[in-house]
Amino acid sequence: MMELGNYCFYIYIKQPKNKQMKRIFLSAFLLVSLSLSAQNIDRKQVVERNNPHLVTMDSLNSLSVGNGGFAMTVDGTGLQSFPKSYSKGIPLGTMSDWGWHSFANPENYKPEESWRYYDYGRGRKEPYATQIKEDKRKKAAGDWYRVNPHRLHLGTLGLSLGSDPKNIQQVNQILDMWDGMIKSSFIYHGRAYQVETTCHPELDMIATHVQSKGSIAFDIRFAYPTGGHCDDACDWNKDHLHSTMLVSQDKNSAVLKRTIDETVYFVMLRWQGTAKLKQKGKNFYQLQSKSADLKLTCEYAEQISSESKTFAEVADAAKVYWNRYWQKGAMVDFGQCKDPRAQEMERRVVLSQ
């Protein structure tokens, strides 16, 4: 498709078979293309007019921030405040490339117990993992290897706003793709909230800035994995099978150690403002503040990290990364096209990147 002024042209090219004619044809086509070239595309304008914009709490409309190796999905509050309400829609996950878990294997199942041998035409029989039903142990082995290892939900970070998302009113949420920031505002029991959420481009770290008329509290919850392939990866009824231990704490930071079977990882919390971390359950902590303005970073890692980033530092790093990202590679601008399908086509092209 080529754009010229207010018109869009779909060009079908049938190349000549003769090589000499091909060269002439290609040269002529390039000259025409250059003569019709428009002004440089305003990439920022194109990206921003296609920013996802939500105005309701909808479990089928969740937004995410991430860096390619780590991501966090949020609800209409800009954080993971209602994970159970979103579990049947687009779940509020927090996952990384390194975050994998396997259930205990007390029966010591071996991979070869789930194998059948087939001839694939290469002169020998080769093993293939299957579900063997006629042998109970082999069936159990196959079932175990079907779900292990599996992706690990690292934890939910949400605002303490009760359990009913219907109490969240006047949602206005935008994913600012140009700067890599989710900007959310809403009303909860008459109180206005403004929330900014972003992700560091190189670290498995979320940063959030919350403003509200009144006190602010963050809920940090952890669930046991399910091993399922089409759920939210959270089993909230097995607290006895995992633990969350407070390793260290000072007035502006805390380190939590997560132990799930043989899987161990750490969660580093750092905040700007007056707040106190309290344990509310075996795998439930709450960061409480009387301040109306609180900034928090939450990093997940296999080892305790010495990185200490403020919200502003994470937001600036994300902005630099995403600004550069959108300024590289190809870009389309259908803003002047009169075809009614152009806007939707542009939206799909931009979001697919």
PLM-predicted stretches and their roles:
Residues K17-I24:
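Positively charged n-region of N-terminal signal peptides that target proteins for export
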Residues F29-A38:
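Hydrophobic h-region of N-terminal signal peptides that target proteins for export
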Residues Q39-Q353:
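Acidic/polar, glycine-enriched structural segments that form the non-catalytic walls/loops
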Residues I11-I13:
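Intrinsically disordered, low-complexity terminal segments enriched in Ser/Thr
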Residues M1-M2:
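Methionine residue identity
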